[in-house]
Amino acid sequence: MAKVHNLGFPRVGSMRELKFAQEGYWSGKSTKEELLKLASEIRKINWDHQKSLDLVAVGDFSLYDQVLDMSFTLGNIPQRARNYSGDVLDNYFRVARGRSVDPKQAISAAEMTKWFDTNYHYMVPEFEVSTTFKLDASRIIDQITEAKNLGLKPKPVIIGPVTYLAIGKEKDNSNKLNQHHYTKTFIQFILLKFIFITITFLVVIKVSSFVTL
């Protein structure tokens, strides 16, 4: 039987609430907790619009960029962002825009480029010979839990391994498609998919509902 679902939903909010919440956090006028609370409220509104569907997308929401989200999910964080104080969210925004709340802890932001032929710009993944991956699926697992607690059937949506490698760039003389990066990346995605399959079975969703882009 056919199931009705989509690949994602706009995340900025009907009145650009996310944009204003981001700016408030970066300027120090609001807290991390307030930003995350607003993000959760936007997700709930989005899911409410989709509640008539058989499956609702999770993982489509982002505080800045979905490709950057996948880099952090894989632990592929530029070395220049690893040695600063603050939490994961602060490092996330440093990679995205050069700095987070503390302007003294600034770095070079990641390169931005167009997502294929669209006007959407994503943060380009970086690869080096020393690049290592460390899986952290908590972001999407938390969103799956949120959707499940609302009585919805979640469908994880992520950037797939081939796409992730293809749109990234080498920052040294390494080759992103050599066996070193290729194997490590696919191992992480296999683990990620196993986690999602396990979760989706727990909420009575067929394995085929898992989608990668």
Spans of features found by a protein language model:
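Domain-level signal for soluble alpha/beta catalytic cores
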Residues: 1-213
